[in-house]
Regions:
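N-terminal targeting/tethering segments
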Residues: 1-98, 102
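Secretory-pathway/luminal and periplasmic proteins that interact with or process carbohydrate-rich
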Residues: 77-85, 142, 151-157
Length: 243
């Protein structure tokens, strides 16, 4: 079952910053279209979380208060500046319309989904093992990406970027490596896949790296199958918008 309160949380946290930046649209039709669009996205995401909670229970996966606390602390440090708890609460309320309790619920849901996405994606595990084997054989990440094709995503920074760059945790991981060293696999900070990172160069505050990403796809595949088969019964009517 999807909690209506989760749907409202997701919707308000999405629409509030948009309205603060853009204001309400003058055209009533456009404004209604925007609201319906974000309501649809919020309901889809609430359904995703409900499925994740079900799979977490079936697979004995849990998220602890400590894990939620640690994630919130990381968010308070985004940009390299640690905000006070009161300052962070004000940001949540002013920018997203959320209380700390509501924010904790959103973090909890996202962590559950991350754990489930990782646990059920055997294809990603097998592909990561293949990448690890190729690294051990002496191959570079670029060569590995050329061999595996669209199964992986290869990226280069193309130069030095800030070590606090918002990039799924790659910059911070690269900062911990020696020049030319390739990291072990790690889960992206957004929980949507595995990364391998190679350090090209670094200074005290900047870093240049290359990376390979293996996306988690099994969770999305299952949700698409569920939606396409009509197994989701929605008690509130929000049409899918055609752009």
């Amino acid at each position: 079952d999807v909690r209506y309160s989760d749907y409202l949380l997701i919707y308000h946290s999405t629409i509030t910053p948009i309205e603060k930046q853009q204001g309400k649209l003058d055209n009533a039709k456009d404004n209604d279209f925007m609201e319906q669009h974000y309501k649809r996205l919020a309901l889809d995401e609430a359904e995703n979380y409900a499925w994740a909670l079900k799979l977490a229970k079936e697979n004995d996966l849990t998220v602890t208060d400590k894990e939620v606390d640690e994630t919130i602390l990381e968010h308070r440090k985004i940009g390299g500046v640690e905000r006070s708890e009161e300052g962070f609460k004000k940001i949540l309320e002013d920018n997203f319309g959320l209380t700390m309790k509501e924010y904790r619920r959103m973090i909890y849901l996202s962590l559950v989904k991350e754990k489930v996405s990782q646990a059920i994606d055997t294809n990603a595990v097998q592909l990561a093992a293949q990448v690890e084997s190729l690294i051990k054989s002496g191959k570079d990440l670029k060569a590995i990406s050329e061999e595996l094709g669209d199964k992986v995503l290869y990226e280069e920074t193309g130069g030095l970027v800030d070590k606090m760059n918002v990039d799924g945790g790659r910059s911070l991981k690269a900062m911990s490596l020696s020049t030319g060293e390739i990291s072990d696999k790690f889960v992206s900070s957004s929980g949507d896949g595995y990364y391998f990172v190679k350090l090209v160069a670094k200074t005290d505050s900047t870093v240049n790296y290359t990376s390979i990403k293996i996306s988690f796809t099994e969770f999305d595949r299952q949700m698409k199958e569920i939606r396409d088969s009509g197994k989701i019964k929605e008690l509130i009517k929000i049409d899918r918008q055609e752009s």
